[in-house]
């Protein structure tokens, strides 16, 4: 499947080159091997989902009867709180489990994109600037998680959401070729390739 996708990307722009580079490494299924068999230590692996943040989609209080508010500053605060909560939860579970692996699933729809005409007016950043914003914030969060020296292995499955598409409608055969989040994930992979 990845080989076919790589062939499909063979003719294309710099964007496709980055995607091809990210897909060039063979797909290896991550393995979490039990390490404690005789000592009686119980092992645990946290599974954390990050998705549907829609960071650039502003919610103005006056448009929602003053019941909510959301903007880029709040998005940054929530992202920081998310990563802090992950570290806190891992620390709490260490009273019961030996935790050496962590699965952080990046589930997509981190951005809203310009799927609808009013998104052009309501979103605080255009799509490419949102990618730069998200990349910077996700890198900060991942570096924060990497400070936990007891975690030996981070497994980060990634999938794109429907909002990151660059086409009017979803395309099943070429979905990843038209996904801004696949580009974002490729950039993250390149950034953390040696971590």
Predicted regions and their residues:
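Generic preference for hydrophobic/aromatic residues in regular secondary structure cores
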Residues: 19, 154, 192-195
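Core catalytic region of metal-dependent phosphoesterases/phosphodiesterases
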Residues: 34-53, 61-186
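Residues that form generic nucleotide/phosphate-binding pockets
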Residues: 21-22, 82, 189
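Short glycine- and acidic-rich boundary segments immediately preceding or forming the N-terminal edge
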Residues: 1-24
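Metallo-beta-lactamase
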Residues: 183-195
